[in-house]
Curated annotation (Swiss-Prot):
GO terms for molecular function: 4 iron, 4 sulfur cluster binding; dinitrosyl-iron complex binding; DNA binding; metal ion binding; protein-disulfide reductase [NAD(P)H] activity. Acts as a transcriptional regulator. Probably redox-responsive. The apo- but not holo-form probably binds DNA. Plays a role in lipooligosaccharide (LOS) biosynthesis by regulating LOS gene expression. Transmembrane segments: none annotated. The lineage of its organism: Bacteria, Bacillati, Actinomycetota, Actinomycetes, Mycobacteriales. This is Transcriptional regulator WhiB4. The gene is whiB4. GO terms for biological process: cell redox homeostasis; negative regulation of DNA-templated transcription. It is found in: Cytoplasm.
């Protein structure tokens, strides 16, 4: 998962803006604790190039794949495999849908359309 490290050791505006509310933090802890990759060596998920597709295999049956992908897209996480998506796949989605404010909402709407 990502973290913010101020260069000079002091908190900055960016880090303050990225703090989660208590409810958001609890929600995130809830889904992260269910992730299949939680016990995986992070080095296996933060690989480059074609190795990312191989790394994404663990995501296929993950019960929180949608939440993970939405979190990575909402936070514009640049590196690693998240929600079964490679870096390139996430960049493409962000470029194709710059209007999306909440990727969780976007995925839910898309899921409802495909079911109904």
């Amino acid at each position: 998962m990502s973290g913010i490290r101020p260069v000079d050791g002091r908190a900055n505006l960016t880090s303050a803006q990225n703090l989660l509310s208590t409810g958001e933090a609890e929600e995130r802890i809830n889904w992260v604790s269910k992730a299949l990759c939680r016990a995986t060596d992070p080095d296996e998920l933060f690989v480059r190039g074609a190795a990312q597709r191989k790394a994404a295999v663990i995501c296929r049956h993950c019960p929180v794949m949608q939440e993970c992908g939405a979190d990575a897209l909402d936070n514009k996480v640049e590196f690693g495999v998240w929600g079964g998506m490679t870096e390139r796949q996430r960049r493409a989605l962000l470029k194709q849908h710059p209007e999306v404010v909440s990727w969780s909402d976007y995925f839910e709407k898309r899921k409802r359309r495909s079911v109904g």
